[in-house]
């Protein structure tokens, strides 16, 4: 089959819609459901991301995509009991497989953004992974294969309409890619730059030149994630997973702030006071996510006011004070930060430092590089100039 008709394009009024190959057969098979235009944009971008993470780290990888940018990306590094709890997988008694662990991390980092996501897996979707996916609100999944038990579970999701795509691992696109805008065809070479090479970290202009192996791994995860994120973009990574992605912002500092805010919320969810929130047993996962998000923010009274807290909790929690948040956030450390282009000013470093960043990889080449370097030196941050820009549109 070299063509697949779609219900509509980006919006219901954009008809007809299809995906097709000018030469050869489509490199994927729809095993269940009917994918939409945006579903497939998410699927094919996320597929590239997880395959590249797999090659760069040697670990199974997963991504959670929404509107053609990742909400989360991770590799299969074992999780702490704390992470299992905040990702709502602590009730799973059997050990999670590496690919299930990667998925739990990718989905769990920014659960608010991942609601209704499209999932990508680098490896075969097994039963533990399918059981995790079964409990989440998601639009679909792309993977190289599925075990029979996993496929049975996924085909039953959303009353049999859940989108399940099997992607060929042999497929290699041509080196030239094209797209049309306003009837005009754009053509460019594919972005096939290798981000797995340690040579990326050869140019280190900061006083601190020490990058641990874990830091290099996390910086590679950040850069590969950014390669498939709408620009401008910045990505915070810790312990083998993205913890804050700032996508599609017009200014670099707003990327850094947005991603930093997400990273802070990820860390705050691990605060004992947040983890001990006395939720009612019948609160749905999505409502729990939303309530936690509000509780950690400035509008906490929306869930703690009299007449409101009773809807979510068995007893009224105490607010998480500004001082408590500041003290907890100060404990975050060893965070890696990647940027899809150079940092023009040191304000980005100031903001990154507040979220525990100790390692940075960015293109370099700003007229204010000296100021950026000096700000890193102020905090003992190790920074590499990669010389690589990673814009994606």
Regions found by a protein language model. Name each.
Residues 1-197, 215-233:
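Active-site loops and adjacent core secondary-structure elements that bind or stabilize anionic groups
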Residues 22-34, 109-115, 188-207, 286-308, ...:
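Gly-rich Lys/Arg/Thr-decorated short loops/hinges at beta-loop-alpha junctions or inter-strand turns
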Residues 71-112, 243-342:
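Glycine- and Gly-Pro-enriched alpha-helical subdomains that act as flexible
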Residues 213, 217, 221, 227, ...:
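C-terminal accessory/binding modules appended to enzymatic or scaffolding proteins
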Residues 56-64, 164-167, 231-238, 268-279, ...:
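Flexible, glycine/charged-enriched surface loops at secondary-structure junctions
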Residues 117, 121-122, 135-165, 170-172, ...:
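C-terminal binding/interaction regions
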Residues 52, 228, 265-269, 354, ...:
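Conserved helix-loop functional segments at active or binding sites
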Residues 69, 125, 238-241, 249, ...:
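Active-site-proximal loop/turn and secondary-structure-junction residues that shape catalytic pockets
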